[in-house]
UniProtKB/Swiss-Prot annotation:
Name assigned to this protein: tRNA-2-methylthio-N(6)-dimethylallyladenosine synthase
UniProt keywords, alphabetically: 4Fe-4S, Cytoplasm, Iron, Iron-sulfur, Metal-binding, S-adenosyl-L-methionine, Transferase, tRNA processing
Database matches in SUPFAM superfamilies: Radical SAM enzymes
Organism per entry: Anaeromyxobacter sp. (strain K)
Record's cofactor remark: Binds 2 [4Fe-4S] clusters. One cluster is coordinated with 3 cysteines and an exchangeable S-adenosyl-L-methionine.
Location of region: Disordered: 1-24
Cofactor (UniProt): [4Fe-4S] cluster
Amino acid sequence: MSDLVPLSRKPAPAAGGPAPSPAAPPRKVYVHTFGCQMNESDSDRMVELLGRHAYARAASADEADLILLNTCAVREKAEQKLLSALGRYREVKARRGALIAVSGCVAQQEKDRLLARVPYVDFVFGPDNIGRLPEMVERARDERFAETGWMDSEEYVFPRADPEAARGRVTAFVTAMKGCDNVCAFCIVPHTRGREVSRPFPDVVAECAALAGVGVREVTLIGQNVNSYTGGCTFADLLRRVAAVPGIDRIRFTTSHPHDLSDALVEVFRDEPKVMPHFHLPVQSGSDAVLRRMRRDYSVAEYLDRFDRLRAARPGIAITTDFIVGFPGETDADFEASLALLERARFEQSFSFVFSPRPHTVAAVRLGSAPEWRDVPREAAVARLERLLAAQRRIAGEILAGELGKVVEVLVEGPSDEPGERLGRTPENRVVHLAADEAAAPAGARVAVRITRAGGSSLSGTLA
């Protein structure tokens, strides 16, 4: 239940002044989102909720009456970015009287410290409290507060999305579940997102159908550990149900734990063409000793067995991953094992970072407590990360270069930043800049593209 008593529902002015009349221009909300796809989806839900209460999305904080910072707590650097951003928005508050709110995982974890350290933050709320945002804005006119309790109501855990808010988009996120029941030694997510809760599958399928009705062609099912889904069917069954929705051409999902990669899910990749050949499968380390300390519940051999079964079921599938470098006790040999795994797997992309101790996690508590938990010097960890990133850049470049001359399917998402170009993605989630105009490649169209250039992290091509 919530940490606070229910908020008053009495009629009251909106933030920053009297409630606008029906003819008055709407108040404006600016959302600064940090972190993962789940946060991006949560930010969209917040804007939709406020839109029902006479708020419109602001293009910049300078024109906002309400500034929301939706935060990430996975790494310490994300918290530092939050404090830096808050400093910039302080002037907007002084000039416009804007309310400032902090949401997301940092808010959940550090609510009291935020309110004490940053006196111009008006209210703080956790991920489970998004459904009460309009009420919290009302309350914030009168007092500062934090609302970070776990909510029992499904309406608050999974705020209903308004499909009209997605009109004009080609892709959309759809929440399938939230939370995580794993206890990885480095991860703060169970403390900030709570236990796993799966959204009933009819709700997920209905939202996908509604999105298809307004022109969305690709959906990404999201959750902290989405392939442990238990919302009335298995995750493999959920993918098949979404694939049956008319108008949905492509399906992706994130994020997954290797331990929960079932044979049934591998079969979906083999049998269902709407499920895209792209899988994010975090490994974290190539060392069994490090994986045991991380409490990842698999060995390198077990990870590679799942990896190889995916590749066999869907030849050409693009597999991406995560690495943590400099985890407590990591030796040079442990790191070399991670490099060897990267070379063996040839990941399409890896999101790699130096270990950052997070409050209340096993790794933070045990850091330095025994030889196997000794701290890795920062300089050594950074040097290892640079080697890993260099190897990944080389491999990614080789993969993209291998696409030269091929004809691939591209789902057009809209205009590119470059004049005269359109932007889209291949089934493997590779970004393609297409030399074509809107008439030849309208948003939502799937077009055949001949790849003519591979550079950086994207491809370029022409209509085939």
